Amino acid sequence: MSLLAQWREDIRCVFERDPAARTTFEVLTTYPGVHAIMLYRLAHRLWRPNALPRPAAVVRARLVSNVDIHPGAVIGARFFIDHGACVVIGETAEIGRDVTLYHGVTLGGTTGAKGKRHPTLGDVVLVGAGAKILGPITIGANARVGANSVVVQDVPEGCTVVGIPGKVVKLREAGQLNPYGIDLDHHLIPDPVGKAIACLLERIDSLEKRVEAGGLVAAAASSTFYEGCNPDNSICETNLRRSAPWSSGRPRRPAHAGDRVSGRAKGSD
């Protein structure tokens, strides 16, 4: 594909993914992400691994768009950086077709060694603002990476990964995939603190009901925690059992204050 054809495809995809885009002139003059990818396409054609200095188009792209794309990176057609700013794409990064990045995304390395050290993104991947994808890992086709996530492990196809470190929170079926939908499932971000609190509230509610029903022995001897808790979590055990504070089946009557006083008096005799 010629350079002009690549530029044309990169511009067309903007109208499919950004509802604010109105005219080609507007896209060409006001979209820094488009400026960055156009200059990258030129620099990539001129780049040679051992050539010094780097193509001037790379420097120009940084000054104009505040986007740093190494000319050695391999980027497929119809690539779009929305709100292009503070995006970094390393030398050995590989990006498939129809990929969308938002501002603040880093496709970085975790080692200074030569060779493959940056991530590979499959086709139709969407990466939210501020996300960091680090190391020679693979993000499968149609995957979604939530905003501000830090991903250091492979992500299967069709999955949504969110959080620090990134965790898979949703797997989409083929019929559920929306190539350009901004469905990052941020509401599924893991919340271990909230989960632990939910466990405790569930336990308190259960104990209160048993106490009100008069089941003091049963409440003290066996308690079931919030059903969604992780059995391996020491805070949220699904079957926590405590020994009863009395040996017989009947609760022991607390000593009256007067009895304790009289007991001390008897002991002093």
Swiss-Prot record:
Organism of derivation: Azotobacter chroococcum mcd 1
GO cellular component terms given for this protein: cytoplasm
Superkingdom of this protein's organism: Bacteria
Segments of this protein annotated with the region Disordered: 242-269
CDD domains: LbH_SAT
Keyword Transferase in annotation: yes
Family of this protein: Belongs to the transferase hexapeptide repeat family.
Protein name per the record: Probable serine acetyltransferase
Catalytic class of the enzyme: transferase
Gene: nifP
PANTHER family in UniProt: SERINE ACETYLTRANSFERASE
EC number assigned by the record: 2.3.1.30
Role: Probable serine acetyltransferase required for optimizing the expression of nitrogenase activity. May be required to boost rates of synthesis or intracellular concentrations of cysteine or methionine.
NCBIfam families hit by this protein: cysE, EPS_EpsC
GO MF annotations, alphabetized: serine O-acetyltransferase activity
InterPro entries according to UniProt: Hexapep, Hexapep_transf_CS, LbH_SAT, Ser_AcTrfase_N_sf, Ser_O-AcTrfase, Serine_acetyltransferase, Trimer_LpxA-like_sf
Skewed-composition ranges (Basic and acidic residues): 256-269
